[in-house]
Amino acid sequence: MGLQALSPRMLLWLVVSGIVFSRVLWVCAGLDYDYTFDGNEEDKTEPIDYKDPCKAAVFWGDIALDDEDLNIFQIDRTIDLTQSPFGKLGHITGGFGDHGMPKKRGALYQLIERIRRIGSGLEQNNTMKGKAPPKLSEQSEKNRVPRAATSRTERIWPGGVIPYVIGGNFTGSQRAMFKQAMRHWEKHTCVTFTERSDEESYIVFTYRPCGCCSYVGRRGNGPQAISIGKNCDKFGIVVHELGHVIGFWHEHTRPDRDNHVTIIRENIQPGQEYNFLKMEPGEVNSLGERYDFDSIMHYARNTFSRGMFLDTILPSRDDNGIRPAIGQRTRLSKGDIAQARKLYRCPACGETLQESSGNLSSPGFPNGYPSYTHCIWRVSVTPGEKIVLNFTTMDLYKSSLCWYDYIEVRDGYWRKSPLLGRFCGDKVAGVLTSTDSRMWIEFRSSSNWVGKGFAAVYEAICGGEIRKNEGQIQSPNYPDDYRPMKECVWKIMVSEGYHVGLTFQAFEIERHDSCAYDHLEVRDGASENSPLIGRFCGYDKPEDIRSTSNTLWMKFVSDGTVNKAGFAANFFKEEDECAKPDRGGCEQRCLNTLGSYQCACEPGYELGPDRRSCEAACGGLLTKLNGTITTPGWPKEYPPNKNCVWQVIAPSQYRISVKFEFFELEGNEVCKYDYVEIWSGPSSESKLHGKFCGADIPEVMTSHFNNMRIEFKSDNTVSKKGFKAHFFSDKDECSKDNGGCQHECVNTMGSYTCQCRNGFVLHENKHDCKEAECEQKIHSPSGLITSPNWPDKYPSRKECTWVISAIPGHRITLAFNEFEVEQHQECAYDHLEIFDGETEKSPILGRLCGSKIPDPLMATGNEMFIRFISDASVQRKGFQATHSTECGGRLKAESKPRDLYSHAQFGDNNYPGQLDCEWLLVSERGSRLELSFQTFEVEEEADCGYDYVEVFDGLSSKAVGLGRFCGSGPPEEIYSIGDVALIHFHTDDTINKKGFYIRYKSIRYPETMHAKN
């Protein structure tokens, strides 16, 4: 039966039932053929200032790209902009069709416009229907700049820990499915998802109008959303989106994809060709893994297809002549797991244990464990359960403080959780019990001693006394079905003087009219004899619960028959602020909410900056000469859907200036959502000074007339802190006779100032200019120096000096950007001299003149002296040069201690990535070297294989090693045998730390010892 013979009803049934294609993933759009977005369906949780993928600069399928991505991403300059059907563009990574594509943000249109805006330059070319499809140009391939979350350290979640928040408008089953997807990643990798506490960076599951989309990797500097929109709440889709969060691009964009699949461009929907661009080797790191047809990150065969039976991606046949299936959305593939484990450097030994009971043992048990082994087990059970760990055998090498071979058990989800114990030797440890639902077990061996190893069993127990002010309680095995024949009793106690608040996120317990079988019982007190609040079962979430004291008693019971998904609840300390005499400090209305309260105002009023008092609505007519304007609610976040207009009017012949003291609005340079507009004049038809959003404080603006219009608008989503601005009306003194200034007059609010050009300073009379002194001392690690009066000609009879000092252990480099000094064969007239030290008596590095840009110059130490001299005759433009620092060099040690620092910005910033620095320390003849670490903080790893400091007893790395060091805390002093030592500092491209500070000196000591590795 042909495609045309299928009725619309049959087509719809085929799509929904999944028969048409192997996997369907509509992303940044809905799967529904008649997709429309109801504003009432948007996330209704308490506003969180998150990075919203739906407001990204552009989309690449379901991947949100921001300005940082665009600045380092280029596409072919021959894409046709004129014939693209922008109205039909959407954001999907699934199957056929363009039904219901949101028209608000056409992906290709956005992509081209943004790249054009940053200067890529797009040309028209008839490459659409019936023409050659767009492809990467050779030039753009050469010009690609490396980019990939997997190779950019800031995109990797530290320690593999990803805090999360789930928006409040998701159903219980959706929440359970999100947790199942996260547990799926945890089960097979060393990535850990944990409910957010006070972490700055975390993900927020939201329901956004653009459907399903996410950024790739960690964005940092606050929360970021993962949008799970309409018809995207499927297990496989969420696992896929979490793959982007973890740091993965789509498999079919790998650089080697043409060896494995064929892109059939004539079958691609017009305007969606860019979704099939492939990345360059420097842009994505496949971590040495083979191309993975089975990856959950792979497109399906008919993604963005013109017709449901037309392939856009055709996999190559295998050795048996069979084309492998692609685009599955069921589970992680072996390749997905291998790549994730490499990306997050998971130990080769250990696993994540999620069953209610189980066992673990050292490798090779009971026949002995290998040396230099590192294993990590993560035990993760249901919140509300505790983990009981019992070691059945212990036979490890015994050492002081268990320094060599040991087992560490921690009460939590990662290596920084509280330590329950560190064990070695042959004494079996006692029973260990966690305080919550996670436990970290780490085993390390570094000796060659052969023992049996260890074996342990664990069990999850539900119930118990909980003394916390907030936390989670879930039925055993949640989000999977609870187990039969369970009885769990919890007694929750919060701080004295408070109540216990309990809210349910999910609830599904076997239904019965009187809850006679499976049920949850909640009592207002500390025991089963306390007053009954409710006995709950069925599928309806119970109402929020508030105890009358600081204690709440809960009991969950399941029988031996029907099992359901169970429940998930949050508890916290609660008080009714509105019941207090001052009603929480609210001026007009107090609204108590569980866990908090809100002040409200009568109609015609809005909350003031303190969020308690009420004042007239924002905006208005301002006739004062000066004053302050703030966003509604300042200094708290401004409310949504606000439109405030201030009309500022000053006397005639006056001008109005506005200066922002603080500025933080949603948005970037597009300013489509929340923004401030400033006009010279009374209406929006007047002269526009600018439209502003984001976090950059606008420049001071002065009106052209005696009135100014300031308009603020916010949309219904993300709110920020807003702005605080001061306006001031004054006459423009610079408009008459340049304000009496010899060079430049700058009008300021309420006054004016005179300024002088480069090479001159302001006279004591504050109006005239005189030549400046030419002596500067520079201590910054990088910057510019210029000849006097730059970029105009330098003055005659001038002598200027610069002394540049860098942090000890670093050399100064001088690179010239422009150079034009009077020419002479021996530079006898005007010239620039550079010395290798702090004075003109130091060795000279160069004497420069003429118009040829000199080669860069480098000092041997951390100081450089520069002198510029001009005579009485010819003047030229002069020079502009950049000074910077480089690590390493030859350092002379004396009996007086000297200092050496790991990087130029030590103390201000962490060391940068991809460093390889070598310092050669030479002592006085007949002496040795003493190295004393004053500060040491370098990325920690068992073998110091990532970032490390290595010391050698000689001229090169072939000499005897005195130690390789990493981690936190200074190593012991190091003594050389000879009079020369080499220090090598290496960093990779991921985690950066504070660095190190070494004090070294020359000593005469006959019995020095090598430091131990």
Swiss-Prot record:
Q: Name one GO cellular component term.
A: extracellular region
Which GO MF term does the entry hold, naming one?
Answer: metalloendopeptidase activity
Instruction: Provide the binding site for Zn(2+).
Output: 240, 244, 250
According to the UniProt entry, what is the EC number of this protein? 3.4.24.-
CDD domains of this UniProt entry?
Answer: CUB, EGF_CA, ZnMc_BMP1_TLD
UniProt cofactor(s):
Zn(2+)
The region annotated as signal peptide is 1-30
Q: In which tissues is it expressed?
A: Highly expressed in brain and kidney and weakly in lung, skeletal muscle. A perceptible level of expression is observed in heart and testis.
The positions flagged as active site in the entry are: 241
What are its GO biological-process terms?
cell differentiation; proteolysis
Q: Where in the cell is it found?
A: Secreted
Domain CUB per the UniProt entry, residue ranges: 349-461, 462-574, 618-730, 774-886, 887-1003
Q: Where in this chain does the record put each EGF-like domain? A: 574-615, 730-770
Which InterPro entries does this entry report, sorted A to Z?
BMP_1/tolloid-like, CUB_dom, EGF-like_Ca-bd_dom, EGF-like_dom, EGF-type_Asp/Asn_hydroxyl_site, EGF_Ca-bd_CS, MetalloPept_cat_dom_sf, Peptidase_M12A
What pairs make up the disulfide bonds?
190-346, 210-232, 212-213, 349-375, 402-424, 462-488, 515-537, 578-590, 586-599, 601-614, 618-644, 671-693, 734-745, 741-754, 756-769, 774-800, 827-849, 887-917, 944-966
Keywords noted in UniProt: Calcium, Developmental protein, Differentiation, Disulfide bond, EGF-like domain, Glycoprotein, Hydrolase, Metal-binding, Metalloprotease, Protease, Repeat, Secreted, Signal, Zinc, Zymogen
What the record notes about the co-factor is: Binds 1 zinc ion per subunit.
Transmembrane intervals = none
Specify where the region named Disordered lies, as residue ranges. Answer: 124-150
Q: Which residues form the propeptide?
A: 31-147
Domain Peptidase M12A positions: 148-347
Glycosylation sites (chain numbering): 169, 359, 390, 626
- UniProt function note: Protease which processes procollagen C-propeptides, such as chordin, pro-biglycan and pro-lysyl oxidase. Required for the embryonic development, especially heart development. Predominant protease, which in the development, influences dorsal-ventral patterning and skeletogenesis.
Name listed for the protein in its UniProt record = Tolloid-like protein 1
Q: Supply the source organism for this entry.
A: Mus musculus (Mouse)
Which gene does this sequence derive from? Tll1
